[in-house]
């Protein structure tokens, strides 16, 4: 069971007859028409299923199988499940499964499965074949699970008939949607192409900037090499000049020495 499912909550509110094993103080209000504030031992009280199950597990009460799950009613279901009205037992199958687990009654569980299977086929067949009819009386004789089966089949059948009767209109609408989607795709493609062109232009500009940077670097390298060569040549010239001057000084010194020697003689 789901905690937030309204049908599960209502199913657990179904009344089940219980027999108290002990005196229960301050629980007399549970018994309808009783003025005694306490519940006497042996009292039979109709309690909600959730309360009866909790008290039975604690051995405070014994649960009495409801009449609709006893042999008389079960024999009617076995004879012809489709003619039985479930107006008074909207949660017959759900509570029946839980009671079969509580009492360990496997035969009851098998009977519930068989009844649901046979009624399901008849209910589904009616739901897809009934057209433009009042279904409130049919739904009133079903359990809440059977109502869901019938409602889903009935709605699906009517939706299919409406779709078949307006098939041309549906195709036209789909064509318009196709044209709209095509135009939107073209717009998207054009915008994408413009974005690609702008990206290509940006890439070209970046390449040009890189080329300019490379040219500037080459020019700088050439200027540096020229300056280095000029400085080297100037250094070489300076060295040559210094060598020439030293050679001249040496020659002049030699001439002076020889002149002195001649003068001394």
Swiss-Prot record:
The keyword Nucleus applies. Gene3D superfamilies: 1.20.58.2050. Keywords: DNA replication, Nucleus. InterPro entries: GINS_A (IPR021151), GINS_bundle-like_dom_sf (IPR036224), GINS_Psf3 (IPR010492), GINS_Psf3_sf (IPR038437), PSF3_N (IPR055221). It is found in: Nucleus. GO terms for cellular component: GINS complex. Residues 183-246 have a biased composition (Low complexity). Residues 255-265 have a biased composition (Basic residues). GO terms for biological process: DNA replication; mitotic DNA replication initiation. It comes from the Eukaryota. Belongs to the GINS3/PSF3 family. The GINS complex plays an essential role in the initiation of DNA replication. PANTHER family: DNA REPLICATION COMPLEX GINS PROTEIN PSF3 (PTHR22768:SF0). This is Probable DNA replication complex GINS protein PSF3. The gene is gins3.
């Amino acid at each position: 069971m789901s905690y937030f499912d309204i049908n599960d909550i209502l199913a657990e509110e179904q009344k089940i007859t219980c027999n108290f094993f002990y005196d229960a103080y301050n629980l007399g209000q549970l018994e309808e028409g009783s003025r005694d504030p306490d519940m006497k031992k042996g009292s039979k009280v109709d309690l909600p299923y959730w309360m009866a199950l909790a008290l039975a597990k604690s051995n405070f009460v014994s649960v009495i199988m409801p009449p609709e799950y006893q042999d008389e009613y079960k024999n009617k279901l076995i004879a012809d499940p489709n003619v039985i009205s479930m107006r008074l037992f909207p949660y017959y199958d759900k509570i029946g499964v839980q009671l079969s687990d509580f009492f360990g009654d496997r035969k009851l569980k098998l009977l519930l499965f068989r009844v649901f299977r046979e009624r399901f086929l008849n209910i589904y067949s009616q739901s897809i074949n009934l057209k433009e009819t009042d279904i409130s009386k049919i739904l009133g004789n079903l359990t809440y699970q059977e109502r869901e089966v019938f409602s889903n089949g009935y709605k699906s059948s009517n939706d299919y008939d409406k779709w078949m009767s307006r098939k041309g209109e549906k195709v036209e609408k789909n064509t318009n949607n196709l044209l709209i989607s095509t135009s939107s795709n073209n717009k998207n493609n054009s915008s994408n192409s413009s974005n690609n062109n702008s990206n290509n232009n940006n890439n070209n500009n970046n390449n040009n900037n890189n080329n300019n940077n490379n040219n500037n670097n080459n020019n700088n390298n050439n200027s540096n090499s020229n300056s280095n060569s000029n400085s080297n040549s100037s250094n070489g010239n300076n060295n040559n000049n210094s060598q020439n001057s030293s050679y001249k000084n040496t020659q002049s010194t030699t001439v002076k020495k020889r002149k002195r020697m001649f003068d001394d003689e």
